[in-house]
């Protein structure tokens, strides 16, 4: 049997058997992204008695309805109702969560290129220089909510900066812009993409005794595309744009011993995005709130200075 169901408006086809019913039967219900009120259930089958058994014929015995998967529940009085399974959110829901979680990872990957630039020019004398840095990283993310994804991120950052030296100190001031593209594969099927355009500024102060302070500010424009795989195998898609902004402050001390340098540091990073509302093609309405992240970090960077015969300098 096939049932047209609109849980959000409490409407559905119903199978009413006035007499005794015997046998095993399956009910097929169409998936939808529209969310009903929490805890809603809807009676689909009633019989006048007998040993009939009705189960949901959809793949896995579940149907996607809004945020949660629904199953066919035997009420014990010769009736069966469609009821939500709050233990399992739908694949579409996990994919929406995944897209929101991917943007801070994009921000961090882009920020790292500027942090690397500031680290590489410490103790280096120059006037003005242009630089570039490629991004090629992969992230695997899992969450307690049942959402998970793999992100492959590639991109390029271009920048220009100048160094101003004084008797005991020097400062660096620079600007940068960049682009990155993320391919995201969702653990429960489907995929997404994030195209990021970033612009920012940075500055650094360094004392000849090795003490330093660095700062970075940047803004991002994210173009997001999402293709969800529903439990029935169908695809729901959507797209939206969002904006992000963040800042990073780092302070530490740089010791140099011959060609080796050791740099312990303490850093703080903040990032936020604006909230966005969008609707998937299956009717699911996603209300994505502001993402806010504040992170403290302590670590040590160790590097070795190498001058190659062709004049190239490496410092891994």
Descriptions of predicted regions:
Residues 12-14, 113-118, 157-160:
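Short alpha-helical segments and helix-capping/turn motifs at coil-helix boundaries
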Residues 1-42, 296, 302:
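Extracellular beta-strand/loop-rich repeat segments of large surface/secreted proteins
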Residues 15, 27-28, 45, 54-56, ...:
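Generic preference for hydrophobic/aromatic residues in regular secondary structure cores
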Residues 25-30, 48, 54-56, 195, ...:
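A broad "ordered helical/assembly scaffold" signature
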Residues 4-6, 73-76, 89-97, 124-129, ...:
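Membrane translocator/pore-forming domains, dominated by Gram-negative outer-membrane beta-barrels
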Residues 4-5, 40-48, 54-151:
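Interface/linker segment at the passenger-translocator junction
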